[in-house]
Amino acid sequence: MHLGNLHQTIEMPGQNKHKKVAMKVNTMAEMIASGQTPEVLFWVGCAGSFDQRAQKITKAFATILDKAGVNYAILGKEEACTGDPARRAGNEFMFQMMAYQNIQILNGYSIKKIVTTCPHCFNILKNEYPALGGNYEVIHHTQFLQELIEQGKIKITDSNEWKGKSITYHDSCYLGRANEIYEAPRKVLESLDMELREMKRCKSKGLCCGAGGAQMFKEEEKGDKRVNMERADEAIETNSDFVASACPFCNTMLTDGIKNRNEEVNTEVLDIAEMIAKAMQ
């Protein structure tokens, strides 16, 4: 089973659903059939499955898990969209259909611990699934990376390519304000020995990238300036070599904003997992 080979997803215009992440990872069904119980379920998410840019984040995180010796699995074709965009858009019926389907599968496998690279999936699995009978320990990948680093399972090379470079970090709304996870991503970046330059609006006062609350899937509203352009400008103002994100949607919005300003040569947007994967021994 390949990462991203999901049964159901959000389909964006022009999206090729047949382009998968070519990386072999065990599914829950395969592991249970062989009498194994994984330590953690990696919830890939729609973006991480079908968006070509986000697939790189998925591969990077899976590579880290493999190198760190984590016993994990994915759902594969059994993973459907969490229903987050449906609920944010006001389609409660659709959300509950999707959520109950996922919960039935998760509970059927007696899942206890879930890790995901998507703050949207993280937030809804952690905070909204319990009301429907889905009770799990849900952690974001930056939290898991911090744990693995502290446990010595992730070792960073002294000569990693990020060392001495400057970076600014964008706080995802669902990770930051919604769940108050500010330090884990920054602690992980500290391990790379980079210079962290905070944007003028950060942490609890951070500005949305423009994709939150299902805004990524609707037409823009009239205004003087696109939200992602405003945020990209704040990132560019820090004169950092890199912009780190911890959300596939934020990554897309910031990348588009920086390209629009013709700054992609000077400032590259990367997920924290991509940076750690390259820096590992």
Regions found by a protein language model. Name each.
Residues 50-57, 148-149, 173-191:
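Active-site glycine- and acidic-residue-rich loops that bind
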Residues 132-161, 201-204, 262-281:
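Short, flexible loop segments at boundaries between secondary-structure elements
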Residues 222-241:
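A short, acidic, amphipathic alpha-helical segment used as a generic capping/interface helix at domain edges
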Residues 1-79, 83-117, 122-129, 148:
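Iron-sulfur-cluster electron-transfer modules
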Residues 92-94, 126-127, 180-181, 185, ...:
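Iron-sulfur (Fe-S) cluster-binding segments and ferredoxin-like electron-carrier domains
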Residues 44-49, 77-90, 115-124, 170-178, ...:
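Local cysteine-cluster metal-coordination motifs and their immediate loop/turn environment
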Residues 59-71, 182-195:
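Short helix-loop-beta junction
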Residues 139-144, 150, 163-178, 195:
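Catalytic cores of enzyme domains
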